[in-house]
Amino acid sequence: MKIAIDILTPKQCMFFSKLSERLEGRGHKILRTTRKYREVNQLLELKGVDAKIVGEHGGGDLASKLKASAKRILELSLVIEGFKPDVAVSFSSPELARVAFGLRIPHVCVNDSPHAEAVAKLTVPLSTKLLTSKMIPKKAWTKYGIPPDNIVQYNALDPWVWLKNLKPDPQILRQLMLDDSKPIITFRTEESFASYLLGKSLAETPIIPLIKQVLKRRRDVQVVAVPRYEEQKKSLFEIFNDKITICESTVDGPSLLYHTSVFVGGGGTMTTESALLGVPTFSCYPSKPFEILKYLVKNKIVTLERNPNQLLKKIKSTLDDLEKAKKTQAEKVQMLVKDFEDPIEVIVAEVEKLG
């Protein structure tokens, strides 16, 4: 079989590199495509994944997103026409879903983010199959126009794909000039350019005031910030300069989290990764909690707190008895993942059925 896979975000790079590796191992020919987007391009290079760049990220406003997507559909259609895949796979790529639909190629959509309404509306109705976490009810998807019978669920969280056999890179601490004898608090900024969060700036989230308070009250702590975009990186440098470690290029996130004492996330993937790796994890997600976040909070492996003062108190309490907090977290995670299945196996089976 010939299979086209579109990789648009760092999470998709981690997920689809494992999927394409498995498919290639089974004798299938894979075409990987991506777009011009700093974090993804750097991570693909870091992981040694070869992908053809087609089009670019639309940026932070709706008009730019629309134009970039329309242009990318045209460019991608030529690439897909040339490759002639039997099946197309994406994590709700609006461009690949539209191209596959237009060329009558079965499209397998992998998605764990029904809260991202814009991309769901543009992809889910055009998909032959939707592969998603069992933690998300089917009714969260059927409202987008896909029949329940076309939804296949797996009992796992997506990051389990690359975390279950994780081998952390021991060079990450040296690379970021961190001391493993001192506590490390890692902050991940939110997805401020995502269509579902447009209108919220970095300054409006708890991240900035929280980092300021941590620096003021805990001089023994090393602070690491992982920005998503150049604009976020510039803002952090302007405010903190060299008082914190700001990841200037894409880093191996799971390896950093492995050495992290406490994690504070404004998004989804790194928050889930951190929790599953047994790190005491806090979320300051700036909007209504999405399905996976609700699941993590319900199972008490993530604490949701947007108030900077309350969050600071909880971080301090965690750091005061860090070993106990990590032991408790690890025990909860162990109970949670013992029945997880491998999502890649489920997806491979569905893709091969369509071929």
Language model feature labels by segment:
Residues L276-S317:
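Catalytic binding pocket for nucleotide-activated donors in carbohydrate/polymer assembly enzymes
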Residues E24-S69:
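Conserved nucleotide-sugar phosphate-binding/catalytic loop shared by glycosyltransferases and other
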Residues R72-L76, E230-G266:
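Donor nucleotide-activated moiety binding/catalytic core segment of transferases
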Residues K47-G60, I211-C247:
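Catalytic donor nucleotide-activated moiety binding site of glycosyltransferases and closely related
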Residues A88-V99, C109, S255-L293:
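A donor-sugar binding/catalytic signature common to diverse glycosyltransferases
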Residues L131-L202:
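A nucleotide-sugar donor-handling region in carbohydrate enzymes
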Residues S317-V333, K353:
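Conserved donor-nucleotide binding/catalytic region of nucleotide-linked donor-dependent transferases
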Residues V108-V110, A120-T132, L257:
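A conserved, positively charged/aromatic
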